[in-house]
Amino acid sequence: MNTEKPLFFDTSDGQNLRINTISTYLKRHFGRKIVKLSIDGGFTCPNRDGSRGTGGCAFCSSAGSGEMAAGTGEIYLDLESQINLIRGKWPQAGYIAYFQSHTNTYAPVEFLRKKFEAALRHPDVIGIAIATRPDCLPDDVLDYLAELNSRTFMWVELGLQTIHPATQQTMNLCYTTEDYDMAAERLMSRGIRVVTHLILGLPGETEKDMMASVSHVCSRHVFGMKLHMFNLVKGSPLAVTCSDYVSFETMDEYIDLVIKAIEIIPPDITLHRISGDAPRPILIAPEWSYMKRTLLNSIHKTMKDRNTWQGRLT
């Protein structure tokens, strides 16, 4: 058990943060507020076009988990329109262009270059985040990402979701834990930051299963992790096959489990998300999950009440 509170516990603005949030990390790294802007780069997915599978992952809507992403096809203009909306609130902020929808390395390198370089041409963009599948990182793409990483702040977000083969098959992921391990190793060997996405509460998984997935990712020594509850959304295959499934019946049930996960995550791993925020019009369950601010406040309050923090059990 780690009884020494980590460095992020006390912050200069008087907050007592108990997790190493990416927003806190970025503010310390750049010395100012950094905002992540979701972008739809016009990519597709090998799990939709037949090269890996069809129908997509069972939990994905037709937007490929990018319901919040802006996507007119003009990357620079999409960024500019989002920045204009929030510039008044944070006039000194910098921005990270987050390519979120579908699989953002599933294309020839020249297509990737066109999209990513367009984002980096914006004078207020200080970095880039790229979400992808672990089985879509061929050598030429990795070489380009390494070159990109050498001249901007960057991370690659790998969707793992779970390490358990039975769930991977049920969710129609069409990739394996071994694919993830190899992708993470190949990225990190090139000096590229890796952020791993996990879903808590997938159908059929126990608390022990979920903690095993978290522990596995921690053993990879990644830069960051994303955790959130399984959200059943309209337009996903599971909305048809598991229409009555609820991952966590109550907010308190999720809070208890996610805190257990946070306690075993080393404090040097940045947490990019600890909740899900599916748009309310497409959210089926759990109904309480749209109350993101209430949930986050409750997680932090509960951690304070329990006098616990990220990495306490490492």
Task: Briefly describe each language-model feature range.
Residues 1-96:
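N-terminal [4Fe-4S]-dependent radical SAM core
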Residues 2-24, 33-35, 224, 232-314:
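Auxiliary Fe-S-binding modules of radical SAM enzymes
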Residues 35-39, 95-97, 128-130, 154-158, ...:
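Hydrophobic faces of well-ordered beta-strands that scaffold small-molecule active sites
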Residues 63-82, 86-109, 124-137, 153-180, ...:
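Core AdoMet radical
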Residues 74, 107, 111, 171-179, ...:
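Alpha-helix N-cap and loop-to-helix initiation/capping positions
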Residues 86-90, 116-123, 143-153, 185-189:
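Acidic (Asp/Glu)-rich catalytic clusters
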Residues 109-117, 138-149, 170, 210:
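Distinct, well-ordered alpha-helical segments
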Residues 178-237, 252-275:
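Conserved C-terminal portion of the radical SAM core fold
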